[in-house]
């Protein structure tokens, strides 16, 4: 009898919880319509995988790409709407969050074509790969709009877990397994450190979890200038440093870049940074509003270390992917300048603009590496020697993307860095901008060294990989070249038409 009553109570409680969740989704679902499109795409992928055979593989790419494009369209239609807080304060919709969501969707849309031929050559399971990519995208989008500590952590872990699975997707590759283990351990440690910092915020604010309510709670408890806030700031900054690959928390990055499948590295190299930047900007600017001087100093130190170490270590690399790993550490150091400047002097606008340019430059470079790797099977920088003689289009595309990463005019990277450094200079960050300029010149050296190899015509320097180089006959390589062409064009001309981009970026205020 007692068991029967307890069972009835359990059913009633479960029904109430379900009805409450259904009510929230029914009345708040329109606020996460782009995310709902991705969820529908995920369900559709699973259904087709269960009911079809391998002959329907093109449908998997079509459904994934279409759901991403429709999600971008839905996001653009919602642009300039009034800021809304939904799901009982757990999720916020505003221009600032939406532009980061747009960048994540753009990254995923460009990355899927890069994976087509790679998956066919390595015989990877296509459905699971696309499911992980879409789920990671979904986690990144929720992270951009998360408005409380719990939602932030859940969305961050959703993105991180999919990243770990993608990193170790080629299970037979020992380097991939090693990279995954390092990524998992370092990612788990960084998440623990981040959550420990969150627990300090929760306690000091009197039990608040919403970002704005944490500020009000700190004022009410008079803890906004206490030593506990400094402890929370240190732990959260360290956790964010791992997620952003800031020096000295960058140790996992080169190994993960080198060991993971190249399309996965392309995806993680941009989406993880965009999502982490969205989190860092909001978590530092809102709860730590009263500690701005302290976190500005911390970020300045990390930015300087990242710019110097990243670019110095990139010079000595022999692997193209490891070189790009260290280059990305230096690049994120430049972006941090925009966070430090903040809303004043268009700091956030410069950060968003540079990230848009960085997406095109970085993905364009990785598209070239994917094509070269599939046709030669090597990742060594020396093996690129003389590529221009065999494939001028690929060599020129890679050269343009590398020059744009280095910041040479008139490419997009130059205008992005110019605007970023100008905003930093206007804000009085003279030393930081000077370091950025010096390390940018340093980065041009190792990019030009690779370009010189690409264009060399001396037979003694050309390796057997390029001598035996053949364009792939597979029809699917057109998708990689299409994505590469889009990125190369964007890396070349986006900087010339910066005014509309800046106008949009300047609208992304809290």
From Swiss-Prot:
Its EC number is 7.1.1.-. It catalyses: a plastoquinone + NADH + (n+1) H(+)(in) = a plastoquinol + NAD(+) + n H(+)(out); a plastoquinone + NADPH + (n+1) H(+)(in) = a plastoquinol + NADP(+) + n H(+)(out). Its main location: plastid. GO terms for cellular component: chloroplast thylakoid membrane. It is found in: Plastid, Chloroplast thylakoid membrane. Coiled coil: none annotated. It comes from the Eukaryota. Keywords: Chloroplast, Membrane, NAD, NADP, Plastid, Plastoquinone, Quinone, Thylakoid, Translocase, Transmembrane, Transmembrane helix, Transport. The chain crosses the membrane at residues 31-51, 59-79, 99-119, 124-144, 149-169, 184-204, 229-249, 261-281, 295-315, 323-343, 354-374, 395-415, 418-438, 484-504. InterPro entries: NADH-Q_OxRdtase_suN/2, ND/Mrp_TM, Ndh2_N. One of its GO terms (molecular function) is quinone binding. GO terms for biological process: ATP synthesis coupled electron transport; photosynthesis, light reaction. It is a multi-pass membrane protein. NCBIfam families: NDH_I_N, PRK02504.1. Belongs to the complex I subunit 2 family. HAMAP family: NDH1_NuoN_1. NDH shuttles electrons from NAD(P)H:plastoquinone, via FMN and iron-sulfur (Fe-S) centers, to quinones in the photosynthetic chain and possibly in a chloroplast respiratory chain. The immediate electron acceptor for the enzyme in this species is believed to be plastoquinone. Couples the redox reaction to proton translocation, and thus conserves the redox energy in a proton gradient. NDH is composed of at least 16 different subunits, 5 of which are encoded in the nucleus. This is NAD(P)H-quinone oxidoreductase subunit 2 A, chloroplastic. It comes from Hordeum vulgare (Barley). The gene is ndhB1.
